[in-house]
């Protein structure tokens, strides 16, 4: 019997004390002692966007809002997907366009679509206003940013409700504001000055003037932004609802291209 207990003691030598867990010793194969393993960090799947979209433009006009975005999904610097939509109709009074990671935009489309369905199922005659969608996106983006797992998008929300045009901006950090004209991505440097130049001289535009202005800016972006593409959509929201047109293309002229040098 004593020999039995001695053999048992030898078998369990180095084992865990009562109430404790067994610690697996480190081996050359790379196994790590759980006690010394680093704590699990935040999820970082969206820290490296794969397919991205560039600028989104938005302008208020008398009786509505117009936004525009090209249809290119860039895989790094490769013009990989050339027929994707970056504009979403949320409901009859609201639309949005997104730049940044396309996968995150698809996720937001799914969430917003389900929110709208849930609201319609109540059958109370109410729907989300453009300002409500903008407010929700602000909280959603800030929440994800605070969890160190942001949705890598910058969005332009346009809408028309209660006789008022609405144009709002939300970025991946939850920064949000409203303005008569908006541009994301490279358009903030190239298109926004053109939009503001016109609005400073003529604060209230007609629908035709706003559309022509946006088309002009999309042409300039195609000339100057290497991640843009000459296939785009234009969405307009008025009291009649949301209308998305496209794919469209702008008339371009490259006759002076041979005169530009110094960028080889």
From Swiss-Prot:
- Kindly list the positions at which N-acetylmethionine occurs in this protein: 1
InterPro entries named in the record: Ntn_hydrolases_N (IPR029055), Proteasome_beta4 (IPR016295), Proteasome_bsu_CS (IPR016050), Proteasome_sua/b (IPR001353), Proteasome_suB-type (IPR023333)
The induction text for this entry reads: Up-regulated in liver tumor tissues (at protein level).
Q: Which domain of life is it from?
A: Eukaryota
Q: Tell me which UniProt keywords the record has, alphabetically.
A: Acetylation, Cytoplasm, Nucleus, Phosphoprotein, Proteasome
Single Gene Ontology BP annotation: proteasome-mediated ubiquitin-dependent protein catabolic process
Phosphotyrosine is carried by which residues?
Answer: 102
Tissue specificity of this protein: Detected in liver (at protein level).
The propeptide segment or segments lie at 1-45
Q: Which PROSITE patterns match?
A: PROTEASOME_BETA_1, PROTEASOME_BETA_2
Subunit architecture: The 26S proteasome consists of a 20S proteasome core and two 19S regulatory subunits. The 20S proteasome core is a barrel-shaped complex made of 28 subunits that are arranged in four stacked rings. The two outer rings are each formed by seven alpha subunits, and the two inner rings are formed by seven beta subunits. The proteolytic activity is exerted by three beta-subunits PSMB5, PSMB6 and PSMB7. Forms a ternary complex with SMAD1 and OAZ1 before PSMB4 is incorporated into the 20S proteasome. Interacts with PRPF19.
Q: State the family it belongs to.
A: Belongs to the peptidase T1B family.
* Identification of the protein by name: Proteasome subunit beta type-4
